């Protein structure tokens, strides 16, 4: 498979490795992106897979709860300035309340629903806001979560909605605990609640990479397995909420802290505005020149 410049660029964004290292990795694995990431990690060139940090959109994440239901959603705008606009913030709240009440299957279904039982659809309502605010606005995603009577919701919005987190804490009515765990999730960004949620494929892949790393470091075969298990524990600490040092008390793990409160973490959802969408990057000099020529 031919290795293209766009493939090299994508691998650089995902790993932070140099251009030539990325090209060599892709050539070695015949263009397979996942294998190229593992190749770079095994060689010690990329410490870990990372997503491109560039953010494509501005906007807000928000959480609304009502009884045993809650919704977390992300609504995008073109600029951070509009994200602070009162009309935009009101739109975000209206959309959250609509989704919580109607529980559409997905974004497409939500946009087609009548808004508040009227003649206009949710998309029509967004279009009205676009005309008023003067920027493209879009409902990007949402998750509706339900809990049992004995559970409690927690929510946390960082930087006014740049990051939004919704947690469900089991066997507890401790709202402060639920919010603290949401705050931790916002700050540390775990992928899973516990090790039980990590699939065998993910663990096997990580174990293979760690083993190859140790062998490439020249470690003796007889101690490689022990090293791998130790490093695998570090991996779980990076991705599993309950294994992480609690952000408000680094001397104890989240799991131990929650257990001390006779509670459990059932689930969490974390939205960071614009994650996974590449933002258009304008050349500043060209932008200035374009204004001068007008």
From Swiss-Prot:
PROSITE patterns: EF_TS_1 (PS01126), EF_TS_2 (PS01127). SUPFAM superfamilies: Elongation factor Ts (EF-Ts), dimerisation domain (SSF54713), UBA-like (SSF46934). NCBIfam families: tsf. This is Elongation factor Ts. HAMAP family: EF_Ts. It comes from Shouchella clausii (strain KSM-K16) (Alkalihalobacillus clausii). One of its GO terms (molecular function) is translation elongation factor activity. Associates with the EF-Tu.GDP complex and induces the exchange of GDP to GTP. It remains bound to the aminoacyl-tRNA.EF-Tu.GTP complex up to the GTP hydrolysis stage on the ribosome. GO terms for cellular component: cytoplasm. Keywords: Cytoplasm, Elongation factor, Protein biosynthesis. It is found in: Cytoplasm. Residues 79-82 are annotated as: Involved in Mg(2+) ion dislocation from EF-Tu. It holds the Pfam family EF_TS. PANTHER family: ELONGATION FACTOR TS, ELONGATION FACTOR TS, MITOCHONDRIAL. Belongs to the EF-Ts family.
